[in-house]
Amino acid sequence: MFVDIHTSSKQYKAEVGSGILREAGKTIEALAPASSYLIVSDENVANRYLDVLVSSFSKEPHTFVVKAGEQSKSFHVYEQLAAFCLEKQLDRQSVIIAFGGGVVGDLAGFVAGTYMRGVRFIQVPTTLLAHDSSVGGKVAVNLPAAKNMIGVFHQPEAVLFDTELLATLPEHEWRSGFAEIVKLGFIADASFLAWLRETVPALTSIKADNLQKMVAKAIAIKADIVGKDEKEHGIRAHLNFGHTLAHAIEAELGYGKITHGEAVAIGMRFAFRLSLRFTKEDLRLADYEEWFSALGYDLRLPAGLSAQRLLARMKSDKKTNAGKIVMVLLAQLGAAYTKTVDEHLLLELLEEELGGRS
């Protein structure tokens, strides 16, 4: 399956299919001829699949492997990778290939966007979550106190998504990626949301053809939003539904202590509750709480967190305007909007959530 992605800066395709990794090198060489190729991966992916990707090239590419986990989205690792590019004499005709999950995609993409003021790169995601981060051109590294704060917009030349690679993912990584897929239904496509509820009663029961349809549709929805607002001046902010609180949770717990998507699921439930303060629409929150619980999500705020500290973290969100927290809310299922929300209301709801843990 192919999805066309059109932005103001670039047009490219995302290919979603089973077994495409085995021919990925030839595909990349035909699509983006280069003076040299560099594959960036993490230890987990490299141990399983790096040889398959390397052997698919006609000429052996350079490889750079980082530790798995959010700690690799740092300035220290960024500098190491940029120095490696210089050592291996990558030039402006080179192509960097991000082969991994969202961390690798962000790191490799940020280096590609800044090395020599920008070289081409290709996304080869290996997690369900990375269906989201691999499309749209947002690439960044973290600051110790805030996620994705230092970055650029740098669109890839292509996205190659081999769904066979998802077979080895642990269940918590399925939950992480699936939350971002459901998010797209919540904010932009109620019919897709209904199809997901009907098709996925359990994450272990997704058929191969439905998995490809699900990923391709999610990419298409995001591509449509990004095509209308590449640099996030308007509706692209809707993709941050659930993320204002999610990023605060991740920072408070320490990056890597909870998966991004599981934090987003908690953040979406909070945003649902907040949305109900401003709409008379029936958002069917209880139905979605029941479905997510059946899928194995814990939608409660993690124990031991402080409402005041979470609120302070939320003020570091990129949507914040003049110190005011801007939240993505639902007008109805399939339709989102942004709203500046009084911090006293946010604090009240956070304290309710933390006080309601049992």
Curated annotation (Swiss-Prot):
Record function comment: Catalyzes the conversion of 3-deoxy-D-arabino-heptulosonate 7-phosphate (DAHP) to dehydroquinate (DHQ).
Subcellular location: Cytoplasm
Reaction catalysis annotation: 7-phospho-2-dehydro-3-deoxy-D-arabino-heptonate = 3-dehydroquinate + phosphate
Annotated source species: Shouchella clausii (strain KSM-K16)
UniProt keyword terms in alphabetical order: Amino-acid biosynthesis, Aromatic amino acid biosynthesis, Cobalt, Cytoplasm, Lyase, Metal-binding, NAD, Nucleotide-binding, Zinc
Pfam family membership, one: DHQ_synthase
CC cofactor: Co(2+); Zn(2+); NAD(+)
Domain of life: Bacteria
Protein name listed in UniProt: 3-dehydroquinate synthase
Molecular function terms, GO-annotated: 3-dehydroquinate synthase activity; metal ion binding; nucleotide binding
Assigned EC number: 4.2.3.4
Positions with a binding annotation for Zn(2+): E180, H243, H260
Family under the similarity heading: Belongs to the sugar phosphate cyclases superfamily. Dehydroquinate synthase family.
Residues where NAD(+) binds: G102, V103, V104, G105, D106, T126, T127, K138, K147
Pathway: Metabolic intermediate biosynthesis; chorismate biosynthesis; chorismate from D-erythrose 4-phosphate and phosphoenolpyruvate: step 2/7
Primary subcellular site in the record, as a coarse category: cytoplasm
GO cellular component: cytoplasm
GO BP terms, alphabetized: amino acid biosynthetic process; aromatic amino acid family biosynthetic process; chorismate biosynthetic process
InterPro entries per UniProt: Dehydroquinate_synthase (IPR050071), DHQ_synth_AroB (IPR016037), DHQ_synth_fam (IPR030963), DHQS/DOIS_N (IPR030960), DHQS_C (IPR056179)
Alphabetical list of SUPFAM superfamilies matching this protein: Dehydroquinate synthase-like
Entry's cofactor comment: Binds 1 divalent metal cation per subunit. Can use either Co(2+) or Zn(2+).
